Amino acid sequence: MKFQKYYGIPKDAKYGEEFMGRFPILFQDNKKSMQETCMCWGIDCPIGWYHILEQLCTYLEFHNQQFSKEYGIAVVADQVKEKFGTLRFYFSIAFVDKETGLKVGPDDENDETTSETAALYVARDYLDMLADEAIGEAEMMTEDTCADCGVPLTKDNKVETEGWITFLCDECNAKREEEYANRLNHQENVEQKS
């Protein structure tokens, strides 16, 4: 998959129900309990990656629509989060209803290998490969994208914060440092008054 370069973050961008609702097959587990899925927590990523996640999810949902109708399989998100400064997108290939795209249990009653089941396994492996490649590319892109504003990072403007790993541009890093200094000053003033 080829991702487009940064095209900006919409002012109303967020990863809530509306975002996930645009990709109903991919995010079909987001309303399930925490005993069933980590998607109950939603998408836990910096807003600076919005354009990357939007393109990735559009790509995966496109393939989901094709593979669910043809083979009854789809990519279903298990967890989407930031970890160590980059995207982590965990998924599974699920058996789905060919009409609705919603998960169904596998047909375990027939253990025979037929040409139809052989084609299904080939399709499943191919869909898994497509998803792995696209997700891998997206994960690498997040390392070179400012977590706050989404601009592409280069070795000249990339700052890796200490402690909690985050990749920021110089401008966003300066804003965070200023906010942190202001919080420290406020805390010191409160402590002096008491």
Residue ranges and their predicted role:
Residues 174-189:
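Short metal-binding segments enriched for Cys and/or His
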Residues 146-149, 169:
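Short cysteine-rich clusters marking metal-coordination/redox-active sites
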Residues 17, 21, 29, 33-35, ...:
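Interaction interfaces in information-processing and related assembly proteins
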Residues 153-155, 173-176:
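Cys/His-rich microdomains that often coordinate metals
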Residues 156-161, 179-181:
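Short Cys/His-rich "knuckle" micro-motifs
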Residues 141-145, 162-165:
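Short metal-coordination and nucleic-acid-contact micro-motifs, chiefly zinc-binding Cys/His arrays
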Residues 162-175:
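Cysteine-rich micro-motifs
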